[in-house]
Regions:
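Structured C-terminal cap/extension of enzyme domains
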Residues: 35, 200-304
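Catalytic alpha/beta core domains of metabolic enzymes, predominantly
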Residues: 127-128, 139-251
């Protein structure tokens, strides 16, 4: 299998119509925006794209639509996470048949299985396809289960297509331990930052990044990522600090803040599905004022 190098991966939101159906017209426009503004690859539907609020059939249709719309311009990483192993494996097979370039999954939601069953969960999903297979180590309070370096090494031994780990746990010691051992077991094993805090991740050995904020600040993210890949970590710090400020601004509202920020930048993608709650008018206006006041965003695109 040729080495998979995802680079800077943009994570589009899932646009919804006023009656909360997937808005495929706007999804196509959003995909084009990301491709035209620095994405090396796209991943969807991720948690930033409200994947847990999409029905199984909707996930399949979104992946099919994205593959056709991208039309080979960039690789698509299909996110197939589910609490059920067989459900996630079936979605992975569907994504491969649709034309995805790689598969991404996290630990099973809600359940807290023992390590041997987390290993089995990942192994069955990865074995369902021949594509590069990526595991996402999410924060434990979100995922419900913790991924260990030992478990990842066992998965390397079982799966030839296990290509790398996406980490958004911010557990730097875990990342250090994993990359030191994993690259001995599998040269070329990918460590991918699951957040925009790329400077710290790059210092450990991350070579790619998933970026939910790419819809807001694609130029800033591209600049920071390129400096990190050139090992110019000191020079990347200023951009990293600006990105950290943007993350902090949007953190409390999560997807609702992300969608409100997109609307403020002229790329309205609707509001989140329940149980998430959209920002009220006052909160959205306050967010718009804060975004407009950020000097780091002055060179970022407005509109589509």
């Amino acid at each position: 299998m040729a080495a998979f190098q995802p680079g800077l991966v943009h994570l589009p939101v899932t646009p919804f119509t006023p009656d909360r159906r997937v808005d495929f017209d706007r999804l196509g426009k959003l995909i084009d925006f990301h491709i035209h503004h620095g994405a090396d690859a796209l991943a969807l539907p991720t948690h930033a794209g409200e994947s847990v609020s999409l029905a199984d059939g909707e996930k399949r249709t979104v992946i099919e639509f994205a593959v056709k719309h991208i039309a080979g311009r960039k690789p698509l990483i299909a996110h197939v996470s589910d609490a059920g192993t067989a459900i996630a494996a079936a979605l992975a097979r569907h994504a491969e048949a649709a034309g995805a370039a790689a598969i991404l999954t996290t630990t099973p939601y809600y359940w807290t299985p023992p390590p041997e069953m987390i290993l089995e969960h990942f192994a069955q999903i990865g074995a369902a396809v021949r594509l590069p297979f990526l595991v996402h180590n999410a924060p434990e309070d979100m995922a419900g289960s913790k991924v260990s370096a030992e478990l990842m090494l066992k998965l390397i031994a079982r799966l030839d297509n296990f290509a790398g780990l996406v980490d958004s746990s911010l557990d730097w010691q875990f990342m250090i331990d994993l990359i030191m051992e994993a690259r001995h077991a599998r040269p070329g094993f990918l460590l991918i930052s699951g957040t925009e805090l790329m400077v710290s991740a790059a210092a450990i050995g991350a070579t790619a990044m998933l970026a939910p904020l790419a819809g807001i600040a694609p130029n800033l993210l591209r600049r920071m990522f390129d400096l990190c890949r050139q090992d110019k970590l000191f020079e990347a710090r200023a951009a990293q600090e600006d990105i950290a400020s943007l993350r902090q601004l949007l953190k409390a509202g999560g997807v609702a803040s992300l969608k409100a920020a997109l609307a403020a930048r002229g790329r309205d993608c609707g509001i989140p599905r329940p149980p998430l709650q959209a920002l009220d008018t006052a909160a959205a206006a306050a967010l718009t004022r804060e975004l407009d006041a950020m000097a780091a965003l002055r060179d970022e695109p407005r509109g589509w």
